[in-house]
Every structure is written in structure tokens, then in C-alpha cells.
Amino acid sequence: MCYHRGMSASPATVARAPRGGDLFGHPRGLTFLFATEMWERFSYYGMRALLVLYMVKYLLDPQRAGQVVGLGAFRSALEFVFGPLDVQPLASQIYGFYTGLVYLTPILGGFLADRVLGQRRTVILGASLMAAGHFMMAFEHLFLFALGVLILGNGAFKPNISTQVGSLYALDDRRRDSAFSIFYVGINLGAFLAPLVCGTLGEELGWHYGFAAAGVGMTIGLIIYLFAAPTLPRDAFARREATHAPLDRTGWQSIVALLLLFLPVSLFWGIYEQQGNTIVLWASEHTDRHALGFEIPVTWFQALNPFMIFAFTPFIVALWRRQRAREPSTVAKMAIGCFLAALAYLLLVTAAVVSGGTHASWLWLFVYFVVLTVGELYLSPTSLSLVTKVAPLHLLSMMMGVWLATSFIGGFLAGYLGTFWSSMTKPGFFLMLAIISALAGLAITLLIRPLRVVLQD
């Protein structure tokens, strides 16, 4: 049986968290999921902050690259498709493959939870794999194997922790959007701390210290989740009961609606993921990082986006509450997010032109992150909430995995676009990114009216 927005569901068919009292207006389970996700994102973004710099400045040096098991064959495969790759384009492609594949495997993770293990055990499996993968990153010859373990672990973890947040609330509970925004703060609190801790350790003490710190963070998240069980939804059996339920017309319409939004959202993530790719290189090679007599470490710029999400979320949520009947629909918010991302890259076009080939002020990057962050807040948490509201109940984890696969396409696109960094002018490169994001926003805008009835948005 499928349940959609505006319809209530009975306790027999929808898993609900045990009654343990609300905390600040939300179920206690949200607090534990918040903390677990915070530490998981600490580990992910700690490694992400270092990844491109580590490859460009250290690992892909010809004297070291030969020691990495499997790298020669992997590079040959990439060059067969894309042609010869120097160090920077190769690093961008590896970054793109990693950031893409960590969001493809959630489809399998959602299926595993829905049909085999249940969400709790799948989350535990994923967290354990990721902890192991981060510690493996400390050994450079295991680099590709470590990335593979991290990819598999993320696939098991990511869709199911997000789905459990939605399962804490009835489908018509107006707290759902704010719950995902709060959950998103947890994501970005961990992502903010990660570059400051892992990035500093990696840049100042050695790359492997930064990767080991990421492993410690994931281990802490796993421990928190193991203690959280009494507060979380008991949904594994409910999923099995609904496994063979046929889809009705409304269910198919909801799935088609989500798939129509898939491509433009994927384009957004391809532009967004330049933060950990070419934006790192812009900060390292083309930015004057001196402020008050102090040179800002390159990895610290990766802390700006999550810090701003942490700071801006309460104001965005308050704005939506004040608008009430005038609040943009979920799909309209997603379009606004894409247009703001385009504006962010137009700012970098201006910075590249004004600097005239010299080092641009770090303030340009700061303003870029402000605009991009607001755009992300309009798109990402609202789209996650949309999936949990309209996806058929018995396919919820799988559809969450499919939706997270927008970042799979985006990750590959980010890697491919990054290969043009060395060959294009910097104003031309950033203008290309702005145009792609604006086209994504236009495509979503054209879908607002057709999808309004289907999504009841």
C-alpha cells in the first residue's frame, strides 16, 4: 500500500519511533540521528577536503604513483576514454569517480535495507565499512582499495539514515521539512569541523594524520548509533510486509515526477561538487589567502560552506514560516537553488576578470560560498523531504537511494568538468559552470506547474 502527502497512515503499516518524549518539539530519535550523521559527515568531508590536494601535491607524483596498487590500470582505462591525463586532470577524474560512486551505491543500500537486512543493520554495516576505509587511507599503496571500501560503506549508510529521519514523523506532519533542515545542520556541523581538524592535520603534520582523524570520527558516529536503537523507528518488518504491494496510479505518477527532476538536480550537484575539486585549486593557486597577517590554509575554505549552512538554516526556515501561504513550493525552491548557484559562479567570473591573472582576494571566495550556500539550502533539504513525502512507502529506501544518485551523476560531471581547468581560461571555466546551473534552474522552473498536482506541492 502506498501513502502520499495529505494522507495519514496507520501504525500497522508505518513504522514509528518509540514514544520517549519530544525534544525541542521533535522526537528524541532525531537527536541521535543528528549526531550519527554529524560524525559520518566529519569523516567524509575531512577526507574530501584533502583528497585533490593529496593527489596533486603528493600521491600522483610519478615516484609515488607507481606504488599505488591498481592505479596504473585505472589510469589506462581513463585515458582510453578521455585521452592522455596529466596530474591535475587525473586527480579531478578520480575525485569525480569517488564522489559519484558514493552516491550510486545507495541504490543498492536502499534495496538491501528494504528487502534483506532492515535499515538499522544496514546503517551499522555501512558505518563499519567507512571507518575501515578511512583508516586504510593512511596507507598510500591501498589508496584505491580504501576508496572502494568507502564507496560501499556510504552506499549502505546514506539512504537509510535519511529515511529514518522521515520515519519519525507522520506523512502529513508539518515538522518534516524543518526536521530535515535540522538534520542538514548536523551534516554541515560535521562538515565544518572536518576541514579544520582533518585538513589542518593533513596539511601541517602529514596527509595520513588527516585521514586517520576521519576514521576516528566515523568510529564515534558508529558508537552513537549503536546506543540510539531504543529511540529509532522499528521499520524493517513494516518494509517486508509491504514488499509485494503493487503500485497504484498515484505511486507511478510520483515516481515519474521524481525522475523528471533527476537530471536538472544532477546538473546542480555537478556544479556544486567543484567545491572539493577546482575550487580547491583556485584557492591554492589563484587566491591571496592572507588576512590579518595570517595565511589561511587551503582546506579551511572547505569549512565555509558547512558553517554558513549551520548559520543560515534558522533564518531560511524562519523565512519560510513567515511566508506561510506565500511560501514557494518545494519544486520552486529547487529552481531558486540552481539560479543562486549560477550567480555564485558569476561572482568568480568577475573575480577572475578583475584580478587579471594575479591572485584574487579571498573575499571573493567568501561571497561565493555565501551565495552557493543559500542556493544549497533551497535545494537539498527540501528535495530530501520531497522524496520521503511522495515515494511509495514500500520503496522508500530504494527511492531515496535513487534520488541520492543525482549526486552520482553530479560527481562524474564534476570530475569531467574539472579536466577543463588547466586548458580553459579561468573566467571562461567559471562562466561555463554558471550557464549549466542556470539551465538546470530553467528546466526545473518549467516543471513547477505540471508537477504541482502530482506532488500535491
Indicate residue ranges for each PLM-predicted region.
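Intracellular loop-helix junctions on the cytosolic face of multi-pass helical membrane proteins
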Residues: 1-32, 171-172, 198-297, 316, ...
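Hydrophobic core of transmembrane alpha-helices in multi-pass small-molecule transporters
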Residues: 38, 133, 141-157, 357-378
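A membrane-interface helix-boundary motif in multi-pass transporters
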Residues: 87, 200-216, 327-332, 360, ...
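Central cavity-lining transmembrane alpha-helices of secondary-active solute carriers
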Residues: 92-111, 303-316
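Glycine-rich segments within core transmembrane alpha-helices of 12-TM secondary carriers
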Residues: 102, 175-203, 210-221, 225, ...
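C-terminal ends and interior cores of transmembrane alpha-helices
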Residues: 127-144, 336-357
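Transmembrane alpha-helices of Major Facilitator/SLC transporters
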Residues: 227, 294-324, 337-345
